[in-house]
Amino acid sequence: MPVSGSQLAFDAASAPDPARGVFETLLVRDGRPLQASRHLARLGASVRALYGVALPPGLGVALADAAAGHALVRLRVEAVPHGAPPPLLGVEIAPLDPAVVLPPAEVTLVCVRVKTGAGWHKLIDRSWFDQIEALAGGGVRPLLVARSGELLETTRANVFLLRGGVLATPPLDGSILPGVVRAAVLEHARRLGIAAHELPLTLKHLREADVVLLSGSLALLERAQVRGDRRSAEAADRLAGALAGDVGP
C-alpha cells in the first residue's frame, strides 16, 4: 500500500548540532553538477545564517572540476565551522546507481507525528532523522506530520500532492527544507501550465490526493501514490519528463 494507514508518533524534538556543519548533495550527470548554483546559494545562506561567514570564492569552480569526467555520480560538499572563517570545505564523489534517478516503482509512506519540523538548514547532524527512520522501519519513507496535522516533508525529500491535475506542496515557513528540486518542480509546473500552489496540506489532503510525489536531489522525483485520475497522472509524467530533461540523456 503506497500510503500506509498506520501513524506513528515521535516525541523527541528536533535538536541537531549545527556545529557539525552543513552539506549539499548534488546529482552529477555527464560531468555536470545539476542545479549547482541553487545548491551553492542554499549552502551559502546556511553558512551565513548559522556561522556568520561567507563561503570562499571559487567553490563553484571546484565543484565543476570535481564533477568533470564523471558519467553519473553523487557529489557531496560540506562546510564545517572551525573557529575562524572561512569554514572548512570538503568535496566527495561517490558512485550512484542509475536506478536511483527517477525510479519507476512507487514507494510506501508512513506518517510520523513530530513536535517540530527539521528546519531550514541541511545539517550534517541527521541523528533526529535517523531515529525517525529507525522507528518507521525498513522499506518505507517516513512522512513527517506536525502536531497541527499539517504535512511537512519526509526525512529525505519534499512532498507534493496532485489532485485533479492541480499540484500543491507545503509552504516554506521555516519548518521544512527549501528543496532545490522542489523549486525546480514548481518552475517546471508553471512553464508547463500545471496549476501549482504552496499552501498548508493536511492528512485529509493526503488521503484525497490522486498522486503523491517526493522530490530530492538524487532521485529527482518519486511516486508514493498513483490513482486513476488521468489529469494528475499526466501532470506527474510531464514533471518527471521535465526533470529528466534537466539531467540530460
Where are these regions (language model features)?
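Helix-start/capping segments and mature chain N-termini
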Residues: 1-74, 78-249
